[in-house]
UniProtKB/Swiss-Prot annotation:
Tree of life domain: Eukaryota
Name of the gene encoding the protein in the UniProt record: rps15
Keyword Ubl conjugation: no
UniProt-listed NCBIfam families: S15_bact
Family per similarity comment: Belongs to the universal ribosomal protein uS15 family.
GO MF annotation, one: structural constituent of ribosome
Annotated protein name in UniProt: Small ribosomal subunit protein uS15c
Primary location group: plastid
HAMAP family, per the entry: Ribosomal_uS15_B
GO terms of biological process kind: translation
Location within or outside the cell: Plastid, Chloroplast
Record has Plastid as a keyword: yes
GO cellular component: chloroplast; ribonucleoprotein complex; ribosome
Amino acid sequence: MVKNSFISVISQEKKEENKGSVEFQVFNFNNKIRILTSHLELHRKDYSSQRGLRKILGKRQRLLSYLSKKNRVRYKELIGQLGILEQKAR
């Protein structure tokens, strides 16, 4: 498995920032999601990895929800950089 292929230019910018920031955490969750997704394409019956993927997706969604409430501009910028679809309003 090639982990370095998912790291982009954003990682270079984020190394200088606070690792506890919401953007950095979402970026790390995004990389983990891509890695787990490629793993599950090969191992479809790996249910523990499926559960882990769902947990990470939930964590990322909660962080994005928090960011959209606190700072809409940073939220829009982040989802634009990572290529994440905007969440629908309920």
